[in-house]
Amino acid sequence: MRHILVTAFRNTSAELLVRGISDSDILLLPNDKVLDSEKLISTLSNRKYDSIISIGQRPNIKDKVHVETMAREGLLSIGTTFDCDMLVRLFEEAGIQAKLSCNAGTSYCNCLYFYGLRYLREKQPEAQMVFVHVPFQKNITDFEHFRRQFLRVIAYIQNQ
């Protein structure tokens, strides 16, 4: 069983989706660009994980997820070593539309992803991190079904 950390921003559809995750550590983030990254790095420095799955919401998607392949800070970009194609396949097999994206945004999500990837690259290169954008709750037709299937994908990754 893989040791997984799942992060989600407080008071978002991401937080609602991760409720009920078992056998993984959950880190809820306060929606503060600086504090979010600091809290993640503090957690990573105190405990080793095989995988970090960060979840944030994106306003312009409906009933699907975007699996982010990279994060950017200015002219720098860092790609993930997580198998994003496999993750897209797992979501689709669970009945959730998914696509690869190379745009983690320009604010909280991207900032967390960039600094998380940078920390892992420098301090824990064997660990993998991926960022998944989910819709706002109002943009998910059947939220409970979406949540159950989303948790099924996380459970599959845990058990690899």
Model feature map: region roles:
Residues 1-106, 117-128, 144-148, 157-159:
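N-terminal catalytic or cofactor-binding beta/alpha core of small enzyme domains
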Residues 112-116:
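Buried hydrophobic packing segments
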Residues 133-136:
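An accessory alpha-helical subdomain
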Residues 138-142:
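Short active-site-adjacent structural elements
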